[in-house]
Amino acid sequence: MKKQMKNHETYAGAVWRRFCRHRLALASLAVLVLICGSAVLAPVIAPYDPEAIVGPFGAPPGDEFLLGTDQIGRDMLSRLLYAARTSLFAGVLATLIATALGVFLGLLAGYFGGLADILIMRFTDMVMSFPYILLVLVAAAIFKPGLWSIILILGFVDWPGIARLVRGNVLSLRETNFVKSSEAAGMPAFHILFSEILPNTMAPVLVYATSVMALTMLDEAALSFLGMGVQPPAASLGNMLNSAQSVTVLTKQPWLWICLLYTSPSPRDRSLSR
């Protein structure tokens, strides 16, 4: 038992050492941790209520308001922290929904094959045949605008890629000796799926899921920018950007947060995939 733990720790240490050699991945991880930490601690570190009018209209950055105020006098730093919180919440929850649905359907299609594989994959192909942004916009227009609507829409639109990835892995894994041995021993199909096959498919799924999370955060911001997502006075990176379309405001305010939040997972993903 101790030897197994030692081997596990050695493998984890080797993974961490390889990750640390990738400087861009470390930098992206640091940025992501900073943004996530600020978002999670927003109720503690935000100086003002993000929806309260606390100062003059359009005040420049200063000692009292570090990032200034918006057009109606709300503190920009507080709104930025809560907006990042909203984007992270939407991204994580939508990714969990998409991953759970995609993994489940991919396992069923890959392991059982036959009619189940045909039905699931043809439905997957049908969903993927629609232009992604058009499908999201149509769904967002049908349902009432709001954070939960966007989370559910993105969660139920982003699963096909994960399903195809899992199915491909399952098709190769079901021919391996350990799966054949479990089948010969009379193990139930769902035990084999979730105890033998699923753990061996999680590495590529996790890498893919982090990319999906970045895309869902960007999609949430885009829909909020168009007025189909988070509604004012609630703070979102999208509706904050919509209210700051003048070039003067864009050059003075830290809107690069949305770019950092979207791009920081990518170098980390490439490092993990190695």
Predicted regions span which residues?
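Transmembrane alpha-helices
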Residues: R85-L101, F190-A222
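Short, membrane-interfacial amphipathic segments enriched in basic
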Residues: M1-G13, E64-D70, R74, F190
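Glycine-rich helix-loop "coupling/hinge" segments at transmembrane-helix boundaries
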Residues: A139-I142, V170, D219-I258
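Hydrophobic alpha-helical transmembrane segments of membrane transport/permease proteins
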Residues: S38-I72, F225-A235
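Generic hydrophobic transmembrane alpha-helix motif, especially the helices
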Residues: L66, D70, M76, I97-L101, ...
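Conserved small/polar residues in nucleotide/adenosyl-binding loops
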Residues: Y262-D269
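Transmembrane alpha-helix signature in integral membrane proteins
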Residues: S28-L29, M76-Y111
